[in-house]
């Protein structure tokens, strides 16, 4: 051995004067490899989709691909999120509370305080970063919404872009929403134009499915045994609710019953399925109309449901069509995800893929009382009129609109709960759809679990399913402990105790807490979309499983 040869401490070969007597060692430079037979992982994150929307959760929107996953897995009837998109996605990917990782609110509302700075620390690594160090290929497709605004440009450091947070490939949009016909696309680390136009049959949901399949297939051609993690986040059902007319027309007449009747029909379906207990009662559609703010402000008109019986025929026609368009948007996107499932099945990967399906929060009330042909009006405190929307009635869902249904449908799609997205104090904001499937690893198929689960519990459970301890270091950085708790035991045994005892909620001035049996806590309502002032509500909220006594929480 030659002294001072520059040999690294990890090198276990031999360096001699004669190369014929030397032995190389490639170990220190080898790429990480996954354990034998490690499963693939697919996270499917829907947007703004309430628990009473899909047919497999009792709703009236047909979702055959989601039902296909549910039939091969477990539905969670007591799954909860953060009430808003960026925080939920941060909690999902890190296995920690959103406030732990600086994401107390969406990127657009972040402030220079530790829990709300919009920058996920590197000592709270994403699942993608951990799996990349364990031999997985990692792909992010669709909505991201975890990059600070000042980094969302080509001159930035891109430290919080997907490709800097453990994802090898990215195709999607950095912000919270985008046009589904003409999206703002980023491919890996640079902006690109859509590959086609709506006139050519382009829609973002199809494009995202194509890219998901492409990314997986490209790697499998080279390394067929290498597992992958795909984080797939379609724009559906966030506004704009864009879809081809023929898909909206599939629901012609489906919602003519109105949103109050929809709630009654769906509640009975939920009871029959076991999504809610048989003695569950509906909450009122306008539970806080009599509540005033500290200076006597009335409950905001933007957050008020117009009773269906108070509408004239033209208004009913418009409101029903807006729901048809939304339903068509979801079903079309479901069909594109079905293509991903078909590819996985045809390539022999489906049974050994852990699939996690969630919605990031409850249905959105951002359409205001009348719905809108331009969602941006809501964020500027402007309530769209029926007269304005009727001018574009035949264009709803097309490139000429940026549409959103009326708030009454948000209450309907969150049946049986109160309120909607943004409200961490009420189940309408935080009680959401969730499905977990892994045919080769989870014996339960087509079953429902009512164990209390929070979004931060998902990734700890996936680590548990993999037989993998949460990493102590990632990229050489010591990691903080996870906040979430694995519920793997409950997937096998519905009576299992997951060990979870407490979960807190906070969003834009609203708050709630679940503790063992669901202890209530005072609630405050969030700021109006056009301002940052909050208006207190009366009463209290509980995040427990609904019963006849507490279904209105």
Q: Whereabouts are the PLM-identified features?
A:
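Formylglycine-dependent sulfatase
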Residues: 1-540, 544, 548-553
């Amino acid at each position: 051995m030659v002294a001072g040869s520059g040999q690294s401490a990890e090198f276990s070969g031999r360096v001699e004067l004669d190369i014929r007597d030397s032995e190389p060692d490639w170990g220190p430079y080898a790429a990480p490899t996954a354990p034998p037979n490690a499963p693939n992982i697919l996270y499917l994150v829907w947007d703004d989709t309430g628990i009473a929307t899909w047919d497999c959760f009792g709703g009236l929107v047909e979702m055959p691909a989601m039902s296909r996953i549910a039939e091969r897995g477990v539905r969670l009837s007591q799954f909860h999120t953060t009430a808003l998109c960026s925080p939920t996605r941060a909690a999902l990917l890190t296995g920690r509370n959103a406030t732990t990782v600086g994401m107390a609110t969406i990127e657009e509302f972040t402030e220079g305080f530790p829990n709300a700075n919009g920058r996920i620390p590197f000592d709270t690594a994403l699942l993608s970063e951990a799996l990349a160090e364990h031999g997985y290929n990692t792909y992010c497709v669709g909505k991201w919404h975890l990059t600070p605004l000042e980094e969302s440009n080509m001159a930035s450091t891109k430290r919080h872009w997907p490709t800097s947070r453990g994802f090898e490939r990215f195709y999607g949009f950095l912000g919270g929403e985008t046009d589904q016909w003409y999206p703002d696309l980023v491919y890996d680390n640079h902006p690109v134009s859509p590959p086609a136009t709506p006139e050519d049959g382009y829609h973002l949901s199809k494009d995202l499915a194509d890219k998901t399949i492409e990314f997986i297939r490209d790697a499998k051609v080279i390394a067929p045994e290498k597992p992958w993690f795909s984080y797939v986040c379609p724009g559906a059902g966030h506004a704009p609710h864009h879809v081809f007319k023929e898909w909206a027309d599939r629901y012609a007449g489906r919602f003519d019953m109105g949103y109050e009747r929809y709630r009654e029909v769906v509640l009975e379906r939920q009871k029959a399925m076991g999504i809610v207990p048989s003695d569950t009662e509906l909450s009122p559609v306008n539970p806080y109309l009599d509540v005033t703010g500290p200076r006597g402000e009335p409950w905001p008109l933007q957050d008020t449901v117009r009773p269906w019986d108070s509408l004239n025929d033209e208004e009913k026609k418009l409101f029903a069509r807006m729901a048809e368009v939304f339903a068509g948007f979801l079903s079309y996107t479901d069909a594109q995800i079905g293509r991903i499932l078909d590819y996985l099945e045809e390539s022999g990967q489906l049974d050994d893929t852990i699939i996690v399906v969630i919605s990031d929060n409850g249905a959105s009330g951002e359409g205001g009382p009348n719905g809108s042909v331009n969602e941006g009006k809501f964020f500027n405190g402007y309530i769209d009129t029926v007269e304005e929307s009727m001018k574009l009635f035949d264009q709803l869902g097309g490139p000429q609109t940026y549409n959103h249904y009326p708030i009454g449908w948000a209450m309907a799609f969150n049946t049986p709960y109160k309120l909607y997205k943004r409200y961490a104090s009420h189940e309408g904001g935080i009680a959401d759809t969730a499905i977990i499937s892994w045919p080769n690893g989870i014996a339960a198929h087509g079953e429902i679990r009512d164990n209390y689960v929070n979004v931060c519990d998902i990734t700890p459970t996936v680590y548990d399913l993999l037989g993998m301890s949460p990493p102590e270091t990632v990229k050489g950085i010591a990691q903080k402990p996870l906040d979430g708790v694995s519920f793997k035991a409950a997937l096998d045994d519905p009576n299992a105790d997951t060990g979870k005892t407490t979960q807190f909620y906070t969003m834009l001035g609203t708050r709630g807490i679940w503790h063992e049996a669901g202890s209530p806590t005072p609630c405050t309502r969030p700021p109006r979309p056009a301002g940052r002032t909050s208006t207190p509500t009366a009463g209290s909220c509980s995040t427990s499983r609904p019963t006849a006594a507490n279904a209105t929480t």
